């Protein structure tokens, strides 16, 4: 049997860990496409979420959720392409004075959600 130097084993393990990290990091750091709508002028009220949902659905844009957040609406979409189509459609649908911003938020992975939901048992 051939005896190899230790540095070769260390290098092999380091390369394997690097390859594993390269494969796992994109799975852990996913983002979700969002649109944020808020009134840019005084006196404008937020559009109704159901109205926005219907108008985007008529144009074939798939929506994950619409939620009020702070002083605006947050629309979560399936993909960045859907995000751009929705922004363009909303600029045509809504009257002037609304600010429609593109954003992305991190999506927690399944194990992170389970860990955050698990109760802390002490003693």
Curated annotation (Swiss-Prot):
TM ranges: 9-29
Membrane topology, Cytoplasmic segments: 1-8
Keywords tagged on the record: Cell inner membrane, Cell membrane, Membrane, Transmembrane, Transmembrane helix
One Pfam entry name: SecD-TM1
Periplasmic side stretches: 30-123
GO molecular function terms attached to this record: protein kinase binding
Keyword Transmembrane among record annotations: yes
Membrane topology: Single-pass membrane protein
InterPro entries named in the record: Modulator_MzrA, SecD-TM
Cell membrane found in the keyword field: yes
Compartments it resides in: Cell inner membrane
Biological role: Modulates the activity of the EnvZ/OmpR two-component regulatory system, probably by directly modulating EnvZ enzymatic activity and increasing stability of phosphorylated OmpR.
Similarity comment text for this entry: Belongs to the MzrA family.
Name used for this protein in its record: Modulator protein MzrA
Gene: mzrA
């Amino acid at each position: 049997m051939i005896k190899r130097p230790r540095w070769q084993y260390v290098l092999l393990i380091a390369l394997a860990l690097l390859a594993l990290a390269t494969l796992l990091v994109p799975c852990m750091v996913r983002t979700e496409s969002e649109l944020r709508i808020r009134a840019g002028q005084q006196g404008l009220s937020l559009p109704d979420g159901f109205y926005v949902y219907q108008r985007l659905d008529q144009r074939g844009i798939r929506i994950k959720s619409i939620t009020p957040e702070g002083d605006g609406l947050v629309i979560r979409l399936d993909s960045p392409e859907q995000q751009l189509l929705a922004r363009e459609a909303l600029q045509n649908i809504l009257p002037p004075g609304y600010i429609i911003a593109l954003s992305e938020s991190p999506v927690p992975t399944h194990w992170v959600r389970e860990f955050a939901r698990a109760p802390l048992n002490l003693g």
